[in-house]
From Swiss-Prot:
Pfam families: Cpn60_TCP1 (PF00118). Keywords: ATP-binding, Chaperone, Cytoplasm, Isomerase, Nucleotide-binding. Its EC number is 5.6.1.7. NCBIfam families: GroEL (TIGR02348), PRK00013.1 (NF000592), PRK12849.1 (NF009487), PRK12850.1 (NF009488), PRK12851.1 (NF009489). The keyword Cytoplasm applies. It catalyses: ATP + H2O + a folded polypeptide = ADP + phosphate + an unfolded polypeptide. GO terms for cellular component: cytoplasm. This is Chaperonin GroEL 2. GO terms for biological process: protein refolding. It is found in: Cytoplasm. Its main location: cytoplasm. The gene is groEL2.
Amino acid sequence: MAKQIIFNEQARAALKHGVDTMALAVKTTLGPRGRNVAMGKKWGSPAVTHDGVTVAKEVELKDPFENMGAQLLKEAASKTNDVAGDGTTTATVLAQAMIDEGLKLVAAGANPMILKRGLDKGREALVARIKEQAISLKSRDEIRQVATISAQDPEIGELLATIMDKIGHDGVVTIEEGKGTTLEYELVEGMQFDRGYISPYFVTDSSRMEAVIDEPYILITDKKISAVNDLLPVLEAVLATGKKDLVIIAEDVDGEALATLVVNKMRGTLNPLAVKAPGFGDRRKAMLQDIAILTGGTLISEEVGRKLDSAKVQDLGRARRVKSDKDNTVIVEGFGDKQAIQARIRQLKQQIETTTSDYDREKLQERVAKLSGGVAVIKVGAPTEPALKERKARVEDALNATRAAVEEGIVPGGGVALLNAISALDNVQTQFEEERMALNVLRRALEEPLRQLAINAGEDGSVVVNQVRTLQREHNNPHYGFDVMTGNYVDLMQAGIIDPAKVVRSALENAVSVAGIVLTTDALITEAPEPKKNGARTPSMPDEEF
């Protein structure tokens, strides 16, 4: 396949045009006064969004060289979304400003490689300053403010603050499309997994088709139980304690073992419940180990030399209640050692830090939440399908922003954290003139988010930036900034206009990374379009009569 190549000024001009086109579509969504973007599909109603990364993912330009610029800028938004879950529009605005200023210097003869080195030096100083500014998240009110700013909806902010209050910061929150037009949530207490009872004969509440057992003994094994002889020692040991409540979590229970449990249930000799173990393969063993630690039991596995008939009462877990329906099982308040549970959570968090797989990370986070004992389901409703999807995206952004704020703290919002970080560049040691130029590129770019917020609110961006700086000096308060909703200049921290430090940091790091790539690119290669054959036409299907 033949390729087409462009170089130097022509290549940089194509990249810049692609970057500017992408940024123009994305940055209109910045801030509470930002506009929506409607995205047409080949079928169905258009999707309407206020989310920068969603807009970025839709942009594909016709010119292949310009499209390269757009796709590089998309990387800044996507990577920020992956790391922090929010801040995608800020990353886009920053990257475009750096590319715009940097390409002017390259056109004037500056060495792009030294410019990039200057950008990297400046980034390190700026990230350190953002981390210094960060204040740890303490109150429910601050959580509400972070979520409200991200979602641009006080109702979503209040809902997430309530949920975090009830399930803790490590709890799992899943977001679903609801049936009505309102926002609702449902709390699931304890550890839940997606396996239900093996037989409906174990049901204790026939109206709800649920099996509920209070304070049972819990046998945990990765073995399939078919022979009754494997179960007898455990059944006898439980009955010897004067209790008859037993939950069995196993790969499967069938044959005469299942028949024995059902018959004893019918006679009232035992009150058993058998459920299938969650997960598959190695993940199943890990989840069974989690259940064992949560309930204070021991995983009976032949891999560690334990056969089922060797199980004693001491090996069985305990919990305040186990509830199971045909699809799900919930273990409420396991009797496991609190220190052992915390140690397991720490171990899982270390695995989250080291894993490179997004899927594994998600599953590990679910396990942490289940051990922490909190799962919430948010049901998002709206009058129409496009409104529902747009609102759901805002709830997801707000949730991600809240988690990011818990992780690394909060900084003043409204673009002020980046504005305040500019002074950190004064202490950066430079060796070449181009490095000093790169620091000036960063100084100008860091003003851009505040400038764009003001423009989207119908104000003059440069006037707002200068006024914020003047008021900060007059009040000797670095938290002073512009409230886009009211048009007033206020103490942003007191007004609850705050951003997660992790979001601001990630946006800056990814913007610098993409800007460095664009500035140091001097040639673009893409596939040449196939020439059209003269006189060729698409053959038509012959007419057919039926």
